[in-house]
Amino acid sequence: MSHPHFESPAALYAAYELASTKLYYPRGTVRCSADPMFRTRFARDLGCLLDVDPDVVAWLCLPTEFETALGPHVPDFLVDYEGGVRMYIDAVDETEIPEIAEGAALAGLRYRAVPRREVEEGFRLANARDMLRYARCRTPLNDRLRMLSALEEAGSLTIADCFQVFRETQPLTGISWMYLHRLISMDIDEAMIGPDTVVRRYPR
């Protein structure tokens, strides 16, 4: 997936222009296939969740525009899922706008509006934000192999146990990068990541 570089339609160009004036943290992404561009804080938050969704292969910001009864619309994301499903997604405050959903259907696009309450529910967003601070901090090979070997032997470790494994990088930096790159797994829904959080090898 990539952005068009020439002759962008007017609504798409306007969306790029607006997003280029915004800066939201964390800056790092893992599965965004082009430049991360967000028009709202809420869209950035949804992007955080896309990076920790095990079913997501890749995602793209502001992918296209399509006609609706309200005028041209540019969705926040195009998301490729496992199994070949491709969906256009908007971050919305409450519910989808019927005219936009209808416009997507008429254009032959699979579309979904994700409400704020779904994004902010539980601890997943807060944990994703914390880990994405380290998205660009690649865990050194020695530490990766030590961690995977320790998990192979023990079956699982707590975060506190993992502190003894890492030697070349800070433990939570290494753990975060390995989680984001699907080398290890943790439950990030039920509580904030802490010393007792259990770490396992990512299921293959």
What is the predicted role of each segment?
Residues 1-204:
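Electrostatic, structured charged patches in enzyme active sites and in nucleic-acid/phosphate-binding
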